[in-house]
Amino acid sequence: HVLSAMVSEAYGVATSFDWNSIPEMKGKRIAMAGTNAPLFIPIEAIPVTLGIGDHYQAMQSSLADGSLFYISGMEAFKLKEVAEYFNKTGFGSLSTLVAFMNLDTRKRLPKEVVDIIDEVALETSWRVAEISKKRDQDVEARLLEEGITVNTLPAEQRAQWAELIKDLPGKSAQELDAKGFPATQVLKTYIKFMNEEGYQFPLDYPL
Protein backbone atom coordinates (compact mmCIF):
# COMPACT_ATOMS: atom_id res chain seq x y z
CA HIS A 1 0.00 0.00 0.00
CA VAL A 2 1.39 3.40 -1.00
CA LEU A 3 1.22 5.79 1.95
CA SER A 4 2.67 8.91 0.34
CA ALA A 5 5.25 10.29 -2.07
CA MET A 6 7.78 12.97 -1.19
CA VAL A 7 8.97 15.53 -3.71
CA SER A 8 12.37 17.12 -4.11
CA GLU A 9 13.33 20.67 -4.92
CA ALA A 10 12.96 21.82 -8.53
CA TYR A 11 15.56 20.82 -11.11
CA GLY A 12 17.47 23.53 -12.95
CA VAL A 13 20.81 24.05 -14.68
CA ALA A 14 23.87 25.72 -13.17
CA THR A 15 26.27 26.94 -15.85
CA SER A 16 29.51 28.77 -16.42
CA PHE A 17 27.84 30.77 -19.22
CA ASP A 18 24.77 32.98 -19.35
CA TRP A 19 21.85 31.57 -21.33
CA ASN A 20 18.07 31.83 -21.51
CA SER A 21 17.11 30.19 -24.80
CA ILE A 22 17.37 26.68 -26.22
CA PRO A 23 19.80 27.49 -29.09
CA GLU A 24 22.34 28.73 -26.56
CA MET A 25 22.60 25.19 -25.15
CA LYS A 26 23.75 23.66 -28.43
CA GLY A 27 27.09 21.92 -28.01
CA LYS A 28 27.29 22.66 -24.29
CA ARG A 29 28.38 19.81 -22.03
CA ILE A 30 26.01 19.35 -19.09
CA ALA A 31 26.82 17.04 -16.17
CA MET A 32 23.84 14.96 -15.08
CA ALA A 33 22.55 11.55 -14.09
CA GLY A 34 22.42 9.41 -17.22
CA THR A 35 18.67 8.92 -16.95
CA ASN A 36 18.21 12.62 -17.75
CA ALA A 37 20.16 12.50 -21.01
CA PRO A 38 17.01 12.12 -23.19
CA LEU A 39 15.91 15.59 -22.02
CA PHE A 40 19.02 17.24 -23.44
CA ILE A 41 19.93 15.28 -26.56
CA PRO A 42 17.02 16.78 -28.59
CA ILE A 43 18.29 20.33 -27.93
CA GLU A 44 21.79 19.25 -29.06
CA ALA A 45 23.37 19.71 -25.65
CA ILE A 46 25.91 17.04 -24.69
CA PRO A 47 25.06 14.97 -21.60
CA VAL A 48 28.04 14.13 -19.38
CA THR A 49 27.05 11.28 -17.08
CA LEU A 50 28.39 12.01 -13.60
CA GLY A 51 27.23 11.83 -10.01
CA ILE A 52 26.55 15.20 -8.38
CA GLY A 53 29.70 14.84 -6.27
CA ASP A 54 31.79 15.04 -9.45
CA HIS A 55 30.06 18.05 -11.02
CA TYR A 56 32.27 20.65 -9.33
CA GLN A 57 35.53 19.15 -10.57
CA ALA A 58 34.05 18.53 -14.02
CA MET A 59 33.16 22.20 -14.36
CA GLN A 60 36.42 23.35 -12.79
CA SER A 61 38.38 21.32 -15.35
CA SER A 62 36.07 22.34 -18.24
CA LEU A 63 34.93 18.76 -18.75
CA ALA A 64 31.42 20.17 -18.30
CA ASP A 65 29.91 23.60 -18.92
CA GLY A 66 26.96 23.05 -16.62
CA SER A 67 25.26 20.91 -14.00
CA LEU A 68 21.68 19.64 -13.88
CA PHE A 69 20.66 19.72 -10.23
CA TYR A 70 18.74 21.67 -7.60
CA ILE A 71 19.58 25.30 -6.93
CA SER A 72 20.61 24.24 -3.41
CA GLY A 73 23.53 22.43 -5.05
CA MET A 74 25.03 25.85 -5.71
CA GLU A 75 25.69 25.98 -1.96
CA ALA A 76 25.69 22.35 -0.84
CA PHE A 77 28.17 21.25 -3.51
CA LYS A 78 29.79 24.71 -3.88
CA LEU A 79 28.84 24.89 -7.56
CA LYS A 80 28.56 28.67 -7.23
CA GLU A 81 32.36 28.72 -7.23
CA VAL A 82 32.46 27.35 -10.79
CA ALA A 83 29.02 28.39 -12.07
CA GLU A 84 27.99 32.03 -12.00
CA TYR A 85 24.60 31.34 -13.55
CA PHE A 86 21.56 29.24 -12.66
CA ASN A 87 18.57 28.74 -14.93
CA LYS A 88 15.17 27.76 -13.58
CA THR A 89 14.16 25.58 -16.50
CA GLY A 90 10.75 24.52 -15.25
CA PHE A 91 11.63 20.82 -15.15
CA GLY A 92 9.84 20.52 -11.84
CA SER A 93 10.71 18.26 -8.95
CA LEU A 94 11.23 14.56 -8.50
CA SER A 95 9.45 12.01 -6.38
CA THR A 96 12.51 11.02 -4.40
CA LEU A 97 10.88 8.88 -1.74
CA VAL A 98 7.70 6.83 -1.72
CA ALA A 99 6.56 5.40 1.62
CA PHE A 100 4.96 1.97 1.50
CA MET A 101 3.16 -0.17 4.06
CA ASN A 102 2.84 -3.94 4.04
CA LEU A 103 -0.79 -4.84 3.29
CA ASP A 104 -0.89 -7.74 5.73
CA THR A 105 0.39 -5.50 8.52
CA ARG A 106 -2.10 -2.81 7.56
CA LYS A 107 -5.00 -5.27 7.77
CA ARG A 108 -3.97 -6.37 11.25
CA LEU A 109 -3.92 -2.87 12.72
CA PRO A 110 -6.95 -1.16 14.30
CA LYS A 111 -8.69 1.32 12.00
CA GLU A 112 -7.86 4.26 14.28
CA VAL A 113 -4.16 3.40 14.04
CA VAL A 114 -4.31 3.11 10.25
CA ASP A 115 -6.10 6.46 10.09
CA ILE A 116 -3.32 8.10 12.10
CA ILE A 117 -0.64 6.55 9.88
CA ASP A 118 -2.41 7.79 6.74
CA GLU A 119 -2.86 11.26 8.20
CA VAL A 120 0.79 11.58 9.21
CA ALA A 121 1.97 10.22 5.85
CA LEU A 122 -0.08 12.82 3.95
CA GLU A 123 1.04 15.58 6.30
CA THR A 124 4.66 14.55 5.75
CA SER A 125 4.26 14.83 1.97
CA TRP A 126 2.92 18.37 2.27
CA ARG A 127 5.59 19.36 4.78
CA VAL A 128 8.44 18.05 2.64
CA ALA A 129 7.02 19.93 -0.37
CA GLU A 130 6.77 23.15 1.64
CA ILE A 131 10.33 22.80 2.94
CA SER A 132 11.68 22.06 -0.54
CA LYS A 133 9.93 25.10 -2.01
CA LYS A 134 11.20 27.37 0.75
CA ARG A 135 14.74 26.04 0.36
CA ASP A 136 14.59 26.92 -3.34
CA GLN A 137 13.44 30.44 -2.52
CA ASP A 138 15.95 31.00 0.29
CA VAL A 139 18.93 29.75 -1.70
CA GLU A 140 17.95 31.86 -4.71
CA ALA A 141 17.75 34.97 -2.52
CA ARG A 142 21.21 34.33 -1.08
CA LEU A 143 22.72 33.66 -4.50
CA LEU A 144 21.30 36.88 -5.90
CA GLU A 145 22.84 38.77 -2.99
CA GLU A 146 26.20 37.20 -3.85
CA GLY A 147 25.97 38.30 -7.47
CA ILE A 148 24.95 34.99 -9.04
CA THR A 149 22.64 35.43 -12.04
CA VAL A 150 19.40 33.45 -11.74
CA ASN A 151 17.38 33.26 -14.95
CA THR A 152 13.92 31.83 -15.53
CA LEU A 153 13.57 30.12 -18.89
CA PRO A 154 10.78 31.95 -20.77
CA ALA A 155 7.48 30.13 -21.24
CA GLU A 156 7.84 29.97 -25.02
CA GLN A 157 11.26 28.36 -24.67
CA ARG A 158 9.91 25.81 -22.20
CA ALA A 159 7.09 25.04 -24.63
CA GLN A 160 9.58 24.52 -27.48
CA TRP A 161 11.67 22.21 -25.31
CA ALA A 162 8.59 20.26 -24.26
CA GLU A 163 7.59 19.87 -27.91
CA LEU A 164 10.98 18.33 -28.71
CA ILE A 165 10.53 15.65 -26.06
CA LYS A 166 6.74 15.29 -26.18
CA ASP A 167 6.88 11.56 -27.00
CA LEU A 168 9.24 10.71 -24.14
CA PRO A 169 6.66 10.33 -21.30
CA GLY A 170 4.34 8.15 -23.37
CA LYS A 171 7.12 5.90 -24.66
CA SER A 172 8.55 5.47 -21.19
CA ALA A 173 5.11 4.57 -19.86
CA GLN A 174 4.57 2.06 -22.66
CA GLU A 175 7.85 0.35 -21.81
CA LEU A 176 6.62 -0.14 -18.26
CA ASP A 177 3.19 -1.24 -19.52
CA ALA A 178 4.95 -4.04 -21.40
CA LYS A 179 6.50 -5.19 -18.13
CA GLY A 180 3.10 -5.48 -16.49
CA PHE A 181 2.89 -2.10 -14.77
CA PRO A 182 -0.10 0.23 -15.44
CA ALA A 183 2.24 3.14 -16.17
CA THR A 184 0.16 4.82 -18.87
CA GLN A 185 -2.88 4.88 -16.61
CA VAL A 186 -0.77 6.24 -13.74
CA LEU A 187 0.59 8.98 -16.00
CA LYS A 188 -2.89 9.91 -17.20
CA THR A 189 -4.09 10.07 -13.60
CA TYR A 190 -1.12 12.24 -12.64
CA ILE A 191 -1.86 14.70 -15.46
CA LYS A 192 -5.54 14.74 -14.47
CA PHE A 193 -4.70 15.55 -10.85
CA MET A 194 -2.25 18.27 -11.88
CA ASN A 195 -4.84 19.87 -14.15
CA GLU A 196 -7.40 19.79 -11.35
CA GLU A 197 -4.93 21.65 -9.13
CA GLY A 198 -4.60 24.38 -11.75
CA TYR A 199 -1.29 23.42 -13.34
CA GLN A 200 -1.18 23.86 -17.10
CA PHE A 201 1.22 21.64 -19.03
CA PRO A 202 2.95 23.28 -22.01
CA LEU A 203 1.31 20.76 -24.36
CA ASP A 204 -0.94 17.72 -24.47
CA TYR A 205 1.35 14.71 -24.28
CA PRO A 206 0.44 11.85 -26.63
CA LEU A 207 -0.41 8.86 -24.44
Where are these regions (language model features)?
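N-terminal secretory/targeting leader peptides
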Residues: 1-207
